[in-house]
Amino acid sequence: MRSLNYQLKMLCRHSREGSYATQTNRERMLTLIANELHELGYRKMSERSLKPKHIEALVKRWFDQRLSIGTIKNRMAVIRWWAQKVDKQNVVARSNEHYGIPDRRFIADGSK
């Protein structure tokens, strides 16, 4: 297991906030985010080495993968939780507009 994955898993285990489903989903999303950061070339990261360039790279990747706006916003919420837990909440912009993430659209334009 990679160091970042392990550290984020332990962070989730020590910070038991929310329902069991929320805790499980958060842990899975953080594992996914850690794997994506590794694939993007950010190796040897620790839980405290989160920087704006990492977040911008992740958001760009998610837009390139054509993920839905709701999925991106949910992942940003998990990143904000991570940043708050390691006392780096100023690293993540407070608004999704900073990253170019538009508002959710609840009516589909067409079929996926």
Predicted feature locations:
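N-terminal core-binding DNA-recognition domain of tyrosine recombinases/integrases
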Residues: 6-110
